[in-house]
């Protein structure tokens, strides 16, 4: 960062809090109904209820909303929150959304912020208004109209989506695991395919119970291992006309020269050996050029017959990033931000989590889109928001990489924990790695509920889990 950029950054972070957002021009017919907050309170609007957005809303509500220092509004299109690293378990059926989801409306009421259902479709920076699109129910009936929300400080935390790179057929015939709804939809299709194969008169045909997972990052690799376990559990439940060794096939396809390209080589090699030992077909250096209704076409001409295809490759920001009134975006469609987490074009707008693009000073690569980065940015911005309200210069965010952990279902957990010395890491696996992996979710829960409630939830979970099915059938 040059001297001029640093000077601008410090001026922006010391800038006084902006005046209340502009009201509609008298006589003008607005395109949206406009929600105007209490003018006596600074209004913080958070778009997106993922890990970063919900943790920030909860912390701000507990510290500032409780004392009526600010007004906080969280906007999210979903009704409930599921920790995104758990979506592969939802897809496999080993995690029950109905039991583990957090209801936004109830959580907001308990933690002194407001929840508004909606999805951002645009932004007017001059009036400081976020435009929300209409929402509909499953029958196509309108739930909420198009409207706008005025803000004094805007935090964009809309996460990321998988990137199909324009591959023909990917959107039509592959399922992504970006949301809980998508994960539930995949699980329902999986169970239905098993029931159909069990009930049919003839034998299982080629490709009928084949699942191809495109992208062998953490999500794809974890899903492959989890599916191996749950598909055999479905057979054990009574769908015994299916032979899990002969009829079931899981193929994991990765364009890079190995799976888990973001983790150390030895961790990836260990995961590959385990997956192949389970009978999972691991294909590295394999590029998908087309997804069809009945399978996947590779660049080398091979066709993989598949009844279900999951696309978990690539990461990019949501399409709406390109429609945010001139905010700077990266080639991966993420919002470019400064070390203070402010966007480069507007000091009143922040971005955190997967949708944010930040290259830390002294680094050459951006902060990776991981849950630990989202949580760290949420905690940092919570502290900085108090400084902002008091007109004090904002401090830069410093990312700490604690390593990567990959859960391979009940079989094992592997990973690399970063030490105090940069670049040095400790490879872990087995029970200790599993404990560390589960601790990541406990930390997310503690950010939302506090230590004592998490302890009570854990105790209740251990008492009820023995009476529940290992795999959901609905």
Residue ranges, per PLM feature:
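An active-site-proximal "capping" alpha-helix that borders the catalytic cofactor pocket
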Residues: 72, 370-389, 405
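C-terminal, flexible cofactor-proximal segment of oxidoreductases
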Residues: 6-31, 39, 383-474
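FAD-site-proximal beta/loop scaffold in flavoenzymes
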Residues: 22-32, 172-201, 294-297, 303-308, ...
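FAD-binding core/adjacent interface of flavoenzyme oxidoreductases
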Residues: 2, 6-41, 113-210, 310
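A Rossmann-like FAD-binding core segment of flavoenzymes
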Residues: 69-71, 111, 115-134, 228-339, ...
């Amino acid at each position: 960062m040059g001297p001029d950029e640093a000077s601008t950054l410090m001026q922006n972070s010391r800038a006084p809090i902006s005046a209340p957002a502009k009201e509609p021009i008298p006589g003008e017919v607005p395109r949206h109904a406009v929600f105007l907050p209490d003018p006596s309170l600074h209004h913080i609007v958070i778009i997106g209820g993922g890990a970063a957005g919900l943790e920030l809303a909860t912390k701000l509500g507990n510290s500032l909303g409780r004392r009526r220092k600010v007004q906080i509004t969280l906007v999210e299109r979903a009704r409930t929150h599921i920790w995104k690293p758990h979506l592969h378990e939802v897809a496999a059926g080993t995690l029950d959304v109905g039991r583990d989801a957090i209801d936004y409306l109830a959580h907001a009421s308990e933690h002194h912020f407001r929840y508004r259902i909606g999805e951002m479709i645009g932004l007017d920076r001059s009036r400081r208004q976020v435009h929300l699109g209409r929402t509909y129910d499953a029958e196509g009936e309108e739930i909420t109209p198009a409207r706008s929300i005025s803000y004094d400080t805007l935090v964009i935390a809309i996460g990321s989506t998988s990137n199909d790179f324009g591959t023909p057929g990917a959107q039509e015939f592959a399922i992504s695991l970006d949301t809980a709804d998508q994960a539930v939809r995949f699980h329902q299709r999986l169970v239905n395919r098993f029931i159909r194969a069990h009930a049919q008169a003839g034998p299982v045909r080629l490709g009928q119970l084949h699942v191809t997972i495109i992208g062998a990052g953490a999500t794809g690799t974890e899903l492959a291992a989890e599916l191996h376990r749950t598909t055999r559990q479905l057979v054990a439940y009574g769908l015994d006309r299916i032979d899990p060794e002969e009829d079931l096939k899981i193929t994991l396809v990765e364009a890079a020269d190995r799976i888990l390209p973001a983790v150390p080589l030895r961790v990836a090699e260990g995961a590959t050996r385990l997956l192949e030992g389970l009978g999972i077909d691991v294909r590295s250096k394999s590029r998908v050029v087309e997804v069809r209704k009945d399978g996947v076409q590779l660049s080398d001409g091979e066709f993989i017959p598949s009844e279900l295809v999951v696309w978990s490759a690539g990461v990019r920001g949501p399409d709406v990033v390109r429609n945010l009134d001139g905010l700077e975006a990266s080639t991966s469609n993420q919002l470019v931000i400064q070390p203070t987490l402010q966007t480069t074009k507007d000091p009143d707008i922040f971005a955190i989590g997967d949708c944010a693009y930040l290259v830390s000073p002294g680094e050459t690569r951006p902060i990776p889109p991981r849950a630990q980065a989202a949580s760290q940015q949420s905690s940092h911005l919570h502290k900085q928001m108090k400084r902002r309200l008091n007109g004090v210069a904002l401090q830069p965010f410093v990312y700490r990489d604690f390593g990567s952990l990959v859960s391979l279902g009940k079989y094992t957990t592997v990973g690399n924990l970063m030490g105090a010395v940069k670049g040095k890491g400790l490879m872990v696996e087995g029970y200790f790695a599993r404990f560390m992996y589960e601790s990541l979710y406990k930390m997310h829960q503690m950010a939302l509920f506090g230590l004592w409630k998490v302890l009570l939830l854990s105790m209740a979970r251990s008492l009820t889990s023995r009476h529940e099915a290992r795999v959901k059938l609905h």
